[in-house]
């Protein structure tokens, strides 16, 4: 857990010019807190401690304004900047080195239990403020989703998607 924290602190220091010190990140960055709390809640989820996982996740949402379902899989060095209102669903997967801005939703379009309902972000994806990525499909490595875009179809690696509905 400590290694994940160190990596995430270094990532935030690199990606956010407003971060002035490591202590500032540890004490005052809700995206850092949300990801670290998620690591604990996800571990509880994988141990089949579902209720404990949900309580830990709920505490994280209360403290940060960022809702990450304990079943979601979050990669290393995922940076949630200005995270208020971010929602990441149960079957979502966020690859290493992705960046999510405030108001992003990685949501589902189905209520079917036991199936993949949420998107998969491959490594190095950036999702702009207010964007909604909805459904069980993949956003390819290095893709960029513009602010307030609504994406409901797969996105090719390296593509830039904007608008409602999202298009290249």
Tell what function each PLM region has.
Residues 64, 69-70, 75-76, 81-90, ...:
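Left-handed beta-helix
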Residues 1-64:
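Terminal amphipathic alpha-helical/low-complexity segments used for targeting or macromolecular assembly
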Residues 113:
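Glycine-rich phosphate/ribose-binding loops and adjacent secondary-structure elements
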